[in-house]
């Protein structure tokens, strides 16, 4: 029986933990698969995805900076992917790619199941308005948050995300310059790559954003998350959480879409957490 082919596409992608995660899921469930990392610059992504499909590819994950391009290339989209305008999971079906987004449910599962947070009634500050932010925003709204404030260096992108989400009384955009006047939040989510250069000053944000319940969450993990989590700890956030748990949970959702079984994420997460020092950045 031929081995089923899967991959993660990104640029860069050599750092990705997805091949190791899916290999562990395969061993756990007894499913034999070939999962590789494929580096595809944005201008070559469409052709690379077609070559993968022509070679028997059955499913793919998509990481930065290709999630919005994957949305455009998919022949059909789930409601979550359509609302997000970004795709992180592709399923091959009858010669076509179906687009899904498991980022949001991965984040919510990590926060609620692993960290025990109750998101209902919470006020959320979302930093960023690109593919990562678009992937998690709908799921946070569905989890019962009260208000989401979107802040992005490009205000037009923040406005566009708010328009896409379509809840004007609940989701608003604000300028970075307004951070000092926004009040405090129970959840602050960094969906930017601002920490990639490891600049400690990248998150020089006002301490007034934080209250006694605040959880600060970076969708990145490893070195890219250091600057934001350092700010979170200096601001005395109750929780400072990186994106490793979200990565494992969204991978499990993708695995379930492809194989019809959801693996146990706890042992995989524990093994990766033990290797935390070698982690680089988020999928």
UniProtKB/Swiss-Prot annotation:
Disulfide bond residue pairs: none
Positions that bind shikimate: 16-18, 63, 88, 103
InterPro entries: Aminoacid_DH-like_N_sf, NAD(P)-bd_dom_sf, SDH_C, Shikimate_DH, Shikimate_DH-bd_N, Shikimate_DH_fam, Shikm_DH/Glu-tRNA_Rdtase
Protein's GO biological process: amino acid biosynthetic process; aromatic amino acid family biosynthetic process; chorismate biosynthetic process; shikimate metabolic process
CDD domains in the cross-refs: NAD_bind_Shikimate_DH
Residues at which NADP(+) binds: 79, 128-132, 223, 243
Domain of life: Bacteria
Any GO CC annotation of this UniProt entry: cytosol
GO molecular function, one term: NADP binding
Keyword set, alphabetical order: Amino-acid biosynthesis, Aromatic amino acid biosynthesis, NADP, Oxidoreductase
Pfam family, one: Shikimate_dh_N
EC class (word): oxidoreductase
Residue positions of the active site: 67 (proton acceptor)
Reactions catalysed according to its record: shikimate + NADP(+) = 3-dehydroshikimate + NADPH + H(+)
EC number: 1.1.1.25
Pathway(s) of this molecule: Metabolic intermediate biosynthesis; chorismate biosynthesis; chorismate from D-erythrose 4-phosphate and phosphoenolpyruvate: step 4/7
NCBIfam families xrefs: aroE, PRK00258.1-2
Family: Belongs to the shikimate dehydrogenase family.
Function: Involved in the biosynthesis of the chorismate, which leads to the biosynthesis of aromatic amino acids. Catalyzes the reversible NADPH linked reduction of 3-dehydroshikimate (DHSA) to yield shikimate (SA).
Subunit structure, interactors included: Homodimer.
Protein name per its UniProtKB record: Shikimate dehydrogenase (NADP(+))
């Amino acid at each position: 029986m031929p081995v089923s082919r899967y991959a993660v596409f990104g640029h860069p992608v050599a750092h990705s933990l997805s091949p190791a995660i899916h290999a562990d899921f395969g061993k756990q469930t007894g499913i034999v698969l070939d999962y590789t990392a494929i580096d595809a610059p944005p201008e070559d992504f469409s052709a690379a995805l077609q070559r993968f499909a022509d070679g028997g590819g059955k499913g793919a994950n998509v990481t930065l900076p290709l999630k919005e391009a994957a949305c455009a290339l998919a022949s059909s989209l789930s409601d979550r992917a359509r609302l997000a305008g970004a795709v992180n999971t592709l399923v091959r079906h009858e010669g076509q790619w179906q687009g899904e987004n498991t980022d949001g449910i991965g984040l919510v599962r990590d926060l609620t199941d692993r960290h025990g947070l109750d998101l209902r009634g919470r006020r959320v500050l979302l930093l960023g308005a690109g593919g990562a932010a678009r992937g998690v925003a709908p799921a946070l709204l569905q989890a019962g948050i009260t208000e989401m404030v979107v802040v992005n260096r490009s205000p037009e992108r923040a406005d566009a995300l708010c328009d896409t989400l379509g809840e004007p009384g609940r989701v608003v955009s604000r300028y970075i310059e307004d951070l000092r006047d926004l009040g405090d939040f129970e959840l602050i989510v960094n969906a930017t790559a601002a920490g990639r250069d490891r600049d400690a000053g990248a998150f020089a944000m006002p301490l007034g954003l934080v209250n006694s319940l605040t959880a600060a969450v970076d969708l990145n993990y490893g070195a890219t998350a250091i600057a934001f989590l350092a700010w979170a700890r200096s601001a005395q956030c109750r929780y400072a959480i990186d994106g490793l748990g979200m990565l494992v949970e969204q991978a499990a959702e993708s695995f379930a879409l492809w194989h019809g079984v959801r693996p146990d994420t706890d042992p995989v997460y524990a093994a990766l957490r033990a290797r935390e020092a070698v982690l680089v950045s988020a999928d």
